[in-house]
Structures are given as structure tokens and as C-alpha cells.
Amino acid sequence: MRHRDSLGNDTTVNSGEVEYVTAGSGILQTSAFTPTEHLQSVRFWLNMPDSEKMNDPDYHIIKKEDTKYIEIDGAKITLLAGTLGDSEGYQGKHLPLDLYDVEMAANTTTVLPTPEDRSVMIFVMNGEIKAGGTAIPEKSVAKLSQGDRITIEASSDASFLVIGSLATNERVVWGNTIIMTNERDVEKAYHELEKGTFLKIQG
């Protein structure tokens, strides 16, 4: 995938890599995918605290060589960001983010550690699993309850993402890709887009 943005970045994100974008005070970007027979891409948003929303925007690619591979109870885990046990991956500049890509074979069980201070969710990309005894079908998201570990059972070959961070406990208001804590700031951002004053930092 080719990525271009208002910071001046013009890069290619390859298979197995992660682009880590901090929107901050504002960034405009385009993504163009190379034609291929099979493509699976996931994009999610991590809401920053209101006090950090106007920080400088930033862009970083987590390369495959910067990820770590871990095996727990037969589950093959790619540590993309954050920490897992004693292993550490890429650390963002703001909220802590734990991001794992997990593959499990059919009819296997694994227990993954989950920091008790984190809000954790699972996105099942392929197959079907049970988390804490609750079934999560393919292409579904489940938010986990608080605890220091979670038991995962795979009824078929499965792959899923585990995503964890600190909860901001703040109101979330969004308009398309503008995410704030109140309607006034969302309207202000769109007004700046119309006036051409949205971008505070450009490359």
C-alpha cells in the first residue's frame, strides 16, 4: 500500500507491516492499494485524551523486522506494538498500545496475559474463537472484561488481533474522521478544513 500525507511522507507499507498514524492537530493522507488476488487490511482508531488531541501529528511504519514472534501454548503471536509479558515491541509517543496478531490451530487453547489497567478488545479476522467461554465469530469484535488473563479457545484455524490501551473515560464525538470530546470542536475542525487552516504542520 502506498501512503502519502500532508507531513511530506510518501512511503510503501508492505505485507505484515503496520502504519502508526498520530492525527494530533491534523493530518491529511491518501492510501492506494496495489492490485492483488488477496488482501486483508485492518484500520482502527485509538482515541487520545482531550489534553493531547492538539499535539503534533506523526507517522511511523512498524517494519516486520521490528516485530517480535512469541509462542504461548502453541499460539503463534506477532507482537506488533506494546508489551507482552517480558517482550516489548514498538512504543508510541502517547497512549500505551498493546497490539498482537495471533494465530491458533483448530481445537487448541491458550491463555494470554492482559494488563488489568487496560481496556482490551479482540477482533477475529478469520475463523471462530471463544474468549472466556463466549463465542466470537469471524469478522466480529468483542470487548473483554477486566482481568489479568484471558483463555482463548479456537474451534477452527483462527487469526485475530488483541488490542489494549488505557481508557480515557472521556466523551467521544466524531464526524467522519474528526474525533473530539464535544460537538463544538468537531464543527471547528470542519470550519478550518473549509477555510484551509486545518493543517498546523506541513511537510
Placement of each model-derived feature along the sequence:
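Jelly-roll (double-stranded beta-helix
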Residues: 1-203
